[in-house]
Amino acid sequence: MGIKKFKPTTPSRRHMTTMSFEEITKQEPEKSLIAPLKRKAGRNVKGRITVRHRGGGHKRQYRIVDFRRVKDNVPARVAAIEYDPNRSAHIALLHYFDGHKAYIIAPHNLRVGDVIESGPNADIKTGNTLPLKDIPVGSLIHNIELRPGKGAQLVRSAGAVAQLMAKEGAYAHVRLPSGEVRLIHVNCRATIGQVGNLEHENMTLGKAGRSRWLGIRPGVRGSVMNPTDHPHGGGEGRAPIGRKYPVSPWGKIAIGGKTRRKKPSDNMIVRKRKP
């Protein structure tokens, strides 16, 4: 899928680019696989803002995507490739031979009419899902589980791909897109291939209004706030921040500071990601 450019009829139009949507074959979603999606505008259950710069945006319906792929040994035909407003990747509508329907993340080069399946005995081809123990070392994979049966949690965004590096006993070494090498249990499932919509990262929004369509609100610089609102605030005119380094609204290092939390699963990291 390519990037579509526009004639510069307005200043924003000059830089704006969109996806060409050549892969999309169906406009309306499958009614049995959608659910209402209530927007939270960055608020938690107490109504307090926990994620800033969220709110508004176009109304969406949630597409129920199958991340578990436990329907083993039942082939499915790809009926359509669809747009999903809730993620960067496209989704594929599957029609299983037993009549069941499901959505999956659409891998790169998956086409309408292709037949895919899941299970330990599935072939090593794009779109098939197998346990890591049944996937050859060196294979490119996505949609990776962290716990067997929980459903895919890693490598799901557009263009993302991981590589199975090695297997040792009950665990496999998987290199993630960040460069981190992580131990994952060999009974966890993964899908063969790379996530589709590779050109997504090259798209330019081009104007503020397009961010608002996506539900992203403006981010105000701390230096133009008052001292009560931000550590950078206050002063006469364009005053310097008055610190050695920039900080967040809560006083934590804003550039170069570590933000990743310590978790019990950190002992599964073989090699840390790129700095």
UniProtKB/Swiss-Prot annotation:
Q: Out of the domains of life, which is the source?
A: Bacteria
A molecular function annotated in GO for this UniProt entry is: rRNA binding
Q: Where is this region: Disordered?
A: 222-243, 256-275
User: Which example biological process does GO assign this protein?
Assistant: cytoplasmic translation
Q: Does the keyword Ribonucleoprotein apply?
A: yes
Q: Which UniProt keywords apply?
A: Ribonucleoprotein, Ribosomal protein, RNA-binding, rRNA-binding
Cross-referenced SUPFAM superfamilies, in alphabetical order? Nucleic acid-binding proteins (SSF50249), Translation proteins SH3-like domain (SSF50104)
- Keyword Zinc-finger included in the entry's annotation: no
Q: Which PROSITE patterns match?
A: RIBOSOMAL_L2 (PS00467)
Recorded GO cellular component terms are: large ribosomal subunit
Task: Supply the Pfam families for this chain.
Answer: Ribosomal_L2, Ribosomal_L2_C
InterPro entries assigned to the protein according to its UniProt record, in alphabetical order? NA-bd_OB-fold, Rib_uL2_dom2, Ribosomal_uL2, Ribosomal_uL2_bac/org-type, Ribosomal_uL2_C, Ribosomal_uL2_CS, Ribosomal_uL2_dom3, Ribosomal_uL2_RNA-bd_dom
Describe, as the record does, how this protein assembles with itself and its partners. Answer: Part of the 50S ribosomal subunit. Forms a bridge to the 30S subunit in the 70S ribosome.
Q: Which PANTHER family match?
A: LARGE RIBOSOMAL SUBUNIT PROTEIN UL2M, RIBOSOMAL PROTEIN L2
Role noted for this protein: One of the primary rRNA binding proteins. Required for association of the 30S and 50S subunits to form the 70S ribosome, for tRNA binding and peptide bond formation. It has been suggested to have peptidyltransferase activity; this is somewhat controversial. Makes several contacts with the 16S rRNA in the 70S ribosome.
Give the family from UniProt: Belongs to the universal ribosomal protein uL2 family.
Q: What is this protein called?
A: Large ribosomal subunit protein uL2
User: Which organism was this protein described from?
Assistant: Syntrophomonas wolfei subsp. wolfei (strain DSM 2245B / Goettingen)
Q: What is the lineage of its organism?
A: Bacteria, Bacillati, Bacillota, Clostridia, Eubacteriales
Gene this protein is translated from: rplB
